[in-house]
């Protein structure tokens, strides 16, 4: 019944936006495959966890997550909101620091997640997002967006247009 509902969203011209954790990526990919007529929006990268049983295992989590993202990108109906990595659940622990991170620190720590995802999906299927006010626990809004600009500087003007505007305008018809 869940898959029927997601397929119905596509028939009605709606998107299916979902946030979940990295260990749910395979099920999400299967859902996207079963509803190929629906634009499926992955929020927050399919959040790689860095707390609880995943604490201290960021490299191991990232290796599996990269494989999942690469496989998910084969589903042409999936687009990605790239952002939301500053949540405490991601394990960067900036919310525990006395001094918040700089935009350079954020860009450096998150760069591999962004570049891998944008490389797998292409800029036309990725859109920058903010996750405020949740990310405010870790950094200011201006620090976050300055970090995104630094990451985006590695892309052409046309690709930056897609990441900052074009993909979102296309997906949400605005």
Which residue stretches match the model-derived regions?
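Catalytic pocket-lining loop regions of alpha/beta-barrel enzymes
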Residues: 2-127, 138
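Mid-to-C-terminal alpha-helical segments outside catalytic/metal-binding sites
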Residues: 112-116, 120-127, 135-174
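Active-site glycine-centered loops adjacent to acidic/histidine catalytic or metal-binding residues
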Residues: 131
């Amino acid at each position: 019944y869940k898959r029927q509902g997601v397929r119905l969203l596509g028939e009605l011209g709606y998107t299916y936006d979902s946030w979940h954790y990295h260990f749910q990526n395979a099920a999400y990919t299967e859902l996207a495959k079963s509803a190929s007529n629906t634009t499926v929006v992955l929020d927050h990268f399919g959040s790689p966890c860095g707390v609880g049983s995943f604490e201290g295992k960021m490299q191991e989590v990232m290796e599996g997550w990269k494989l999942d993202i690469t496989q998910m990108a084969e589903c042409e109906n999936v687009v990605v909101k790239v952002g939301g990595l500053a949540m405490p659940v991601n394990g960067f622990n900036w919310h525990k620091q006395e001094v918040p991170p700089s935009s350079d620190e954020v860009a450096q720590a998150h760069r591999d997640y962004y570049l891998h995802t944008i490389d797998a999906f292409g800029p036309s299927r990725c859109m920058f997002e903010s996750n405020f006010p949740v990310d405010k626990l870790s950094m200011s809004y201006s620090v976050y967006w300055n970090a995104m600009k630094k990451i985006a500087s590695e892309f052409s003007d046309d690709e930056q247009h897609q990441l900052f505007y074009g993909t979102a305008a296309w997906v949400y018809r605005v």
